[in-house]
Amino acid sequence: MLALISRLLDWFRSLFWKEEMELTLVGLQYSGKTTFVNVIASGQFSEDMIPTVGFNMRKVTKGNVTIKIWDIGGQPRFRSMWERYCRGVNAIVYMIDAAYREKIEASRNELHNLLDKPQLQGIPVLVLGNKRDLPNALDEKQLIEKMNLSAIQDREICCYSISCKEKDNIDITLQWLIQHSKSRRS
């Protein structure tokens, strides 16, 4: 009954206070980008994901905020597209497989190369270390250090350790995203 009332209130609020945001989700292949989109959209986790070829776009509504998500493929042949899809968005979400330590250096280099693009200056970045449920996954402090996030000074940057499978920290991730819908870029 309480859930029904909550949904009814969310619907009523959405009639008067709609907000939209656009974000781009990037990161190396197999980091969990499409899984993340599925989890925030439907709460469903699936082990059987097919790698994204090119990009997917999906709209997700949470409360009175509609989030347009560009999920860009992480294979090397698609990384040149990242910048184009990151221009003018409210936020860039950079996904890392926190348990695949051998790929951290490549992931760090791709993130810093992307953020060096002048057209992306000032766009907030949310770094998500996914797969925290796996053994040897890096925690937030380790991710900040290994990804050299303290060197990024020209924008807001935030880092969370999440698990799409266990739905760990998905709620605070959504809170961060919704907060950034209020700072729409022109």
Curated annotation (Swiss-Prot):
InterPro entries: Arl8a/8b, P-loop_NTPase, Small_GTP-bd, Small_GTPase_ARF/SAR. Pfam families: Arf. Keywords: Cell cycle, Cell division, Cell projection, Chromosome partition, Cytoplasm, Cytoskeleton, Endosome, GTP-binding, Hydrolase, Isopeptide bond, Lysosome, Membrane, Mitosis, Nucleotide-binding, Protein transport, Synapse, Transport, Ubl conjugation. GO terms for biological process: anterograde axonal transport; antigen processing and presentation following phagocytosis; antigen processing and presentation of polysaccharide antigen via MHC class II; autophagosome-lysosome fusion; calcium ion regulated lysosome exocytosis; cell division; chromosome segregation; endosome to lysosome transport of low-density lipoprotein particle. One of its GO terms (molecular function) is G protein activity. GTP binds at residues 29-35, 71-75, 130-133. PROSITE patterns: ARF. This is ADP-ribosylation factor-like protein 8B. It comes from Pongo abelii (Sumatran orangutan). The gene is ARL8B.
